[in-house]
Amino acid sequence: MTTNTHTLQIEEILELLPHRFPFLLVDRVLDFEEGRFLRAVKNVSVNEPFFQGHFPGKPILPGVLILEAMAQATGILAFKSVGKLEPGELYYFAGIDEARFKRPVVPGDQMIMEVTFEKTRRGLTRFKGVALVDGKVVCEATMMCARSREA
């Protein structure tokens, strides 16, 4: 059985997402299928600036940044599924439901984000996301994103 694996390197991710250091939280896309799912990776380094204060002597990736990494993965999936934004359009993180944190993410971890498309209704697209380290769930959530024109 052969699979058609789609990967994206950092150069391609930078073409899709507006985020830059220190807020770009997707290092590589491991696989995706347009309109269905995406698997991406974030390599967690002790050199990340937020570890200075979260927490000194016991660095833990802030949960909100785990969610942001999953949201960025949904953005990549959306762009690969329906195309890049038109001039004057933005893709907003519009909501989150059922967010659960299961275990901490620490420097040296390789966090895998798996996001799946659920549905689009009234301009909102709903995704399910899970983040894993060593095959164990560290976070899961349902996220909503909206594509809209700038005011």
UniProtKB/Swiss-Prot annotation:
It catalyses: a (3R)-hydroxyacyl-[ACP] = a (2E)-enoyl-[ACP] + H2O. Pfam families: FabA. Keywords: Cytoplasm, Lipid A biosynthesis, Lipid biosynthesis, Lipid metabolism, Lyase. One of its GO terms (biological process) is fatty acid biosynthetic process. It is found in: Cytoplasm. One of its GO terms (molecular function) is (3R)-hydroxyacyl-[acyl-carrier-protein] dehydratase activity. The active site is at H54. Its EC number is 4.2.1.59. It comes from the Bacteria. It is an enzyme of class 4 (lyase). GO terms for cellular component: cytoplasm; membrane. PANTHER family: 3-HYDROXYACYL-[ACYL-CARRIER-PROTEIN] DEHYDRATASE. HAMAP family: FabZ. Involved in unsaturated fatty acids biosynthesis. Catalyzes the dehydration of short chain beta-hydroxyacyl-ACPs and long chain saturated and unsaturated beta-hydroxyacyl-ACPs. Belongs to the thioester dehydratase family. FabZ subfamily. This is 3-hydroxyacyl-[acyl-carrier-protein] dehydratase FabZ. It comes from Salmonella arizonae (strain ATCC BAA-731 / CDC346-86 / RSK2980).
